[in-house]
Structure formats: structure tokens, C-alpha cells
């Protein structure tokens, strides 16, 4: 397949190029496009054949649900049931409206019960649908030029770090999709927060830039789902819950504890790697770069700046891949605010390999 790369001007999105991208979606093709979180791999959410193509292009398990992206709040009614009798949560429509008013367009995905308009191929066989309205201007125009309902997981090979730059998308999906829209680097760098409204209370299934504290200000009874814990047997209802995600090619380990002991431990391991002719890398904040003796040290931003870490994390993991790093050690990061999402992704990327020193 010949993949077209479309470079767009954010200040002039009304031309024929975006209309062409939309036509690809309407005709059953696939287009990778930027959002404020990560790049997405888009197809017609209401066309089961398009959803199957997404799974095939990514090498993604077909029971891993896709998020349906919309550009207008009224679009929910076609794809989600809002009848209060179908939910345990009281005033479901009011809850959705409060969340939408507070966080849409933006990095929040809401799970509701699906209508028959949404094929099971899009929902991973579930009776629920995950819905998001992205804030990125290119994404909004693209969705409107398409069918209005764009199913899109991250635009990468399944299991790899999510793409935050168009070069990441080209590396993974060139030759696998019809078009890649080049919108530059993304703003946030981590996938959206996911909130499930189909149970007895709102549950956070995936942390993101919309934090637990921010959600509590709007829906006070929200809580974190037990499926976020490593040993949970809960069935996955959202992307990122079941399979290994975000992983570099090298073996990643997180090291926690007193920072001096952490640095000493990692430096000791780096020496072992050197003796064994294994290329070793380290992830750390800017302030610690000179304290490490590994051949490759990547910084994610200043101490306490978890937003910078979020924006850099996936790029750093891909840089290690490009440099052939075989073993990676990472410091842990503050879990407050978006730091919770950073640690969620880092732990998954490490396959839950954590060393306490």
C-alpha cells in the first residue's frame, strides 16, 4: 500500500486536502491523524470492515475496544443509549452533560452503553462504547469531513510506545494505512483518561491528563477501577487494560526508593551491562543526568514537572529503540496529578518490573 503523507496548515484547514482525508474514511480506508493526546489511527466507527482494518494494521487483538471520536456533542445520541432505566447511575444524561461541559473537547473518554448503530467490531465485542471529543483543531475538522464517527486507537504497532510525533507514525504504519496527516508534535503526550459510566458508580479505567481530582470536582463519587491493578481478573472494558502496551524493545525496569540508593543501584547495573557488552540506558529528570554512568541517559524534564515527563516519555522510549539500547532503568516519578498517568504507562511499559532499593 502506498501511504500518502499530508502536511497541513493549522490556520487553513478548509481546503480540499482535509476533504480528501475524510473521503478516505467514508470509503472504508484508514487515516492516521493528530490529536492533543497522541496520534490516532482512524477508520469509520460505524463500518465493521473499517474497524477490522484498524486491528489488522496495528496487529491489535480484536477484543481490545476502539474509542469512537466525535466532533459535536449531539453526535452521542446516535451511538450511545442515554435512557436512565438502562443505567445504575442516576441522571445519566446529566452526568454526561456535566463531564462534557467540564472536559470536552479534551482528553476525556466516556464509556456508555452502545446503540445498534455501533458494530461489535468497534467495541471489541462489548455492549458498551467509548466516546471522546478531541480538542485538536485538525482532529475536529478531520472528523467532520469524515463520517462524523471515527474509531481510533493510537497510531502505532500494537504494544509499542504510542506516537507523539508524525515520524513515529511513519515508522510504524507507512505502507499499512492510506494516509498520515502530519500535524506536528502533540500537546499532551499520553492517551486520554477513560471513565466508565455503565456500572454502579463512575470508574476511572485509565488515568490521563484529566486527573482523578479534576473528575471529583464534577462527579464526586468517581473512583479508580480495580482493573488498573496488576493482579485484577476484571474483564477489560477499555483500551490499555489487558495487553502489554507502550513497551520499548529493550527490557525496562523501574527503580524506586531513596534517590541516592536508586542512582547507586542503576550505576552498578550499568557497570554489569558494560562488562557483559549490553547497551544500557537510563531515564531520569534533568537534575540527575550527570550522576549516571550509563552510555545512554535520557532526560524527561525538570523534577516535579510531570507534564513535561508525559510529553517526553514515549519519545524517549522510541529513542532508546533507535539507538539499540537493550536494557533500560528508569527512576520513578511523582504520582500526583498527571503523574499518576505517567507512572501507569511506565509500569505497563516495564511489564510491572519494579525494584525497591
Where are these regions (language model features)?
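Active-site-adjacent structural elements in enzyme catalytic cores
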Residues: 1-357
Amino acid at each position: 500500500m502506498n501511504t500518502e503523507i499530508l502536511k497541513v496548515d493549522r490556520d487553513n484547514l478548509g481546503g480540499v486536502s482535509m476533504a480528501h482525508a475524510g473521503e478516505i474514511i467514508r470509503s472504508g480506508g484508514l487515516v492516521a491523524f493528530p490529536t492533543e493526546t497522541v496520534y490516532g489511527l482512524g477508520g469509520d466507527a460505524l463500518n465493521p470492515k473499517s474497524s477490522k482494518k484498524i486491528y489488522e494494521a496495528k496487529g491489535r487483538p480484536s477484543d481490545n475496544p476502539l474509542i469512537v471520536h466525535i466532533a459535536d456533542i449531539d453526535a452521542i445520541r446516535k451511538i450511545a443509549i442515554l435512557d436512565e432505566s438502562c443505567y445504575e447511575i442516576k441522571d445519566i444524561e446529566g452526568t454526561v452533560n456535566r463531564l462534557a461541559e467540564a472536559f470536552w473537547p479534551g482528553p476525556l473518554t466516556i464509556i456508555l452503553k452502545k446503540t445498534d448503530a455501533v458494530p461489535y467490531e468497534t467495541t471489541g465485542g462489548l455492549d458498551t462504547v467509548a466516546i471522546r471529543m478531541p480538542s485538536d483543531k485538525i482532529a475536529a475538522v478531520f472528523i467532520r469531513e469524515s463520517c462524523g464517527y471515527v474509531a481510533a486507537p493510537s497510531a502505532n504497532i500494537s504494544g509499542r510506545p504510542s506516537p507523539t510525533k508524525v515520524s513515529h507514525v511513519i515508522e510504524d504504519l507507512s505502507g499499512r494505512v492510506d494516509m498520515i496527516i502530519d500535524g506536528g508534535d502533540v500537546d499532551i503526550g499520553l492517551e486520554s483518561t477513560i471513565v466508565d459510566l455503565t456500572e454502579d458508580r463512575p470508574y476511572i479505567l485509565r488515568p490521563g491528563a484529566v486527573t482523578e481530582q479534576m473528575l471529583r470536582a464534577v462527579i464526586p463519587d468517581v473512583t479508580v477501577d480495580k482493573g488498573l491493578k496488576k493482579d485484577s481478573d476484571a474483564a477489560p472494558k477499555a483500551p490499555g487494560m489487558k495487553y502489554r502496551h507502550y513497551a520499548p524493545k529493550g527490557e525496562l525496569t523501574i527503580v524506586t526508593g531513596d534517590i541516592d540508593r536508586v542512582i547507586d543501584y542503576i550505576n552498578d547495573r550499568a557497570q554489569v551491562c558494560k562488562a557483559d557488552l549490553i547497551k544500557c540506558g537510563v531515564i531520569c529528570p534533568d537534575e540527575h543526568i550527570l550522576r549516571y554512568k550509563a552510555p545512554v541517559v535520557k532526560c524527561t524534564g525538570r523534577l516535579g514537572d510531570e507534564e513535561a515527563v508525559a510529553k517526553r516519555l514515549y519519545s524517549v522510549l522510541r529513542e532508546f529503540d533507535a539507538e539499540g539500547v537493550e536494557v533500560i532503568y528508569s527512576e520513578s516519578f511523582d504520582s500526583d496529578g498527571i503523574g499518576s498517568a505517567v507512572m501507569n504507562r511506565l509500569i505497563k511499559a516495564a511489564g510491572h518490573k519494579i525494584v525497591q532499593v
